[in-house]
Amino acid sequence: MSTGGDRLPEAFLRPGSSSFVEFLREVAPQSHPEHARPAGAGDVVHATTIVALSFAGGIVMAGDRRATMGSFIAHREIEKVFPGDEYSAIGIAGTAGIGVELVRLFQLELEHFEKIEGAMLSLEGKANRLTTLLRGNLGLALQGLAAVPLFGGYDLDRAAGRIFSYDVTGGRYEERNHHSIGSGGMFARGSLKKLWRPGLGDRDAIAVALAALVDAADDDSATGGPDALRGIFPVVATVTAEGYRRIAEGELAGLVAEIDAARAQAREGDTR
């Protein structure tokens, strides 16, 4: 209800929670993802593979660009890795529409908290807020419309990168060193286990993330590898003490070329 004239509704003026999600439920409940109308599971677009790994200065997160609808390639250039805020990144796998809305709501949640409280949430606090958002989507997840995030960032208190995985119920699990999710996650995880090592520099860590996505694309039809012909490369970002940085496609193209050349040379040297 308006307080008169051109003033904002009363809900916008009185003191309230630092949670944007709670505010949204009160002011515009129909806009909350938990009230979205379910569609048939076969009619929706699915995002696929996300990888994340730690390195000496923080974390790297990368996602392929393919989205599928059943057995069809629905999109070749979808983006699945986003900044949570200045010191965090979030990637999504599963129902793409639900996942993108989850990311937008999460970004608003962090921004709203900072404006109301005058301070930034700790990385642990951000991970907990994401748990709450996932539990709000549980009804749709049980109908087959699930989106699962991979979250990571730079912990200013610990001066180190940290990675968190989730299940559809909102269960949160901190991962050591690296993790992957999505349809190609198991293949990417095998690659990460072989290539990750302590003390990686940022460039080497980015190369490991790209190699893991290339391996996933080799075995999973729903994961798209780098496509130099079309100029389509994974979305790759680092989060360090300097903040979130998306890696330029020119830099990615050079690293992909190095990976391809090294693998071609290895094949030529294989005499089996």
UniProtKB/Swiss-Prot annotation:
Catalytic residues of the enzyme: 48
State the coiled-coil residue ranges. Answer: none
Location comes to: Cytoplasm
The GO annotation for biological process reads: modification-dependent protein catabolic process; proteasomal protein catabolic process
Give the enzyme's EC designation: 3.4.25.1
Report the activity regulation comment. Answer: The formation of the proteasomal ATPase ARC-20S proteasome complex, likely via the docking of the C-termini of ARC into the intersubunit pockets in the alpha-rings, may trigger opening of the gate for substrate entry. Interconversion between the open-gate and close-gate conformations leads to a dynamic regulation of the 20S proteasome proteolysis activity.
- Alphabetical keyword list: Autocatalytic cleavage, Cytoplasm, Hydrolase, Protease, Proteasome, Threonine protease, Zymogen
Q: Which GO terms describe its cellular component?
A: cytoplasm; proteasome core complex, beta-subunit complex
Cited Pfam families: Proteasome (PF00227)
Q: Which HAMAP family does the annotation name?
A: Proteasome_B_B (MF_02113_B)
- What role does it play? Component of the proteasome core, a large protease complex with broad specificity involved in protein degradation.
Q: What protein is this chain from?
A: Proteasome subunit beta
Q: Which organism is it from?
A: Beutenbergia cavernae (strain ATCC BAA-8 / DSM 12333 / CCUG 43141 / JCM 11478 / NBRC 16432 / NCIMB 13614 / HKI 0122)
Which gene specifies this protein's sequence? prcB
